[in-house]
């Protein structure tokens, strides 16, 4: 586990160039249940310049861009094989797209709207999916049937991958920004205000596990796991991630009793995530 760098280096840059500052985007609605566990094992080390600092850089056109270290994003190998252009797949029940597996029932359309509003001309291909967002988000409308994507599945996936192919670097950064601000940042703030737990100075892998649990369970659904972990500011980073992993492993079957087919997958994932961090 590598220690977090505490200072922003002067002249911190990305492979992106930003303009005037505006207000950050609001957080997304939470998912009430986690997505299907993935058995992905590979990780992409990043499509744009990585720095040692993880956090918000600046806000542009309603998007609070961030820089996130590979250490903090370690968990994405269990989400998408570390693929910013990930399409619908069996592992997520054909419900999610992208690096952080934005679920079409919850966060996919809000993310597309944010990317489209950031640059409507460049990301015009997202408009078709946004216009049919209510249908795409409707759980009764399948994205995959009879061995192939449905019409709606094609509309959503083609729009997403078309946007990625238009500007892989920027569209990847947009995914990072949305996921960080809508999931990780919400839980970091709640841990401090709700439980008195400050993780701002902890190792990025600790933050990554917090993000992982939030990404899987939603900003509301994750909170039980943090409560059950009996966290303390006096814990070492090693003790902290061990408590988090054990909380998921020991309680996920009870919390999500209606989804027994995924219990062992979730338990194994967080056992492996603990190994990643240690």
Sequence positions of predicted segments:
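Hydrophobic helical h-region of N-terminal Sec-dependent signal peptides
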Residues: 8-16
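C-terminal segment of classical bacterial N-terminal signal peptides
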Residues: 17-25
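Cysteine-nucleophile amide-bond enzymes
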Residues: 12, 25, 30
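Cell-wall polysaccharide-cleaving catalytic domain and substrate-binding groove, primarily
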Residues: 28-197, 205-278
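Intrinsically disordered, low-complexity serine/threonine-rich segments
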Residues: 9, 20-21, 75
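Bacterial Sec-dependent N-terminal signal peptides
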Residues: 1-9
């Amino acid at each position: 586990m590598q220690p977090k760098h505490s200072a922003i280096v002067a002249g911190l840059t990305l492979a992106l160039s930003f303009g005037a500052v505006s207000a950050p985007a609001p957080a997304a609605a939470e998912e009430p249940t986690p997505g299907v566990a993935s058995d992905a094992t590979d990780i992409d080390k990043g499509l744009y310049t990585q720095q040692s600092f993880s956090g918000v850089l600046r806000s542009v056109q309603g998007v609070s861009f961030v820089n996130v270290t590979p250490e903090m994003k370690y968990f994405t190998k269990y989400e998408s094989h570390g693929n910013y252009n990930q399409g619908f797949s069996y592992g997520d029940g054909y419900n999610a797209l992208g690096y952080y597996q934005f679920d079409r029932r919850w966060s996919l359309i809000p993310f597309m709207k944010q990317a489209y509003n950031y640059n409507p001309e460049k990301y015009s291909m997202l408009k078709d999916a946004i216009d049919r967002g209510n249908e795409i988000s409707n759980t009764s409308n399948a994205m995959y049937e009879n061995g192939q994507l449905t019409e709606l599945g094609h509309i959503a996936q083609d729009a997403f991958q078309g946007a990625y192919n238009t500007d892989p670097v920027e569209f990847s950064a947009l995914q990072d920004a949305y996921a960080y601000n809508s999931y990780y940042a919400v839980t970091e703030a709640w841990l401090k205000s709700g439980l008195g737990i400050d993780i701002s100075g902890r190792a990025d892998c600790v933050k990554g596990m917090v993000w992982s649990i939030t990404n899987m369970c939603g900003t509301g659904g994750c909170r039980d796991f943090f409560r059950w972990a009996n966290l303390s500011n006096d814990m070492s980073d090693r003790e902290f991630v061990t408590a988090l992993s054990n909380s998921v492993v020991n309680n996920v079957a009870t919390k999500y009793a209606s989804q027994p087919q995924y219990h062992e997958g979730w338990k194994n994932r967080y056992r492996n995530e603990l190994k990643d961090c240690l």
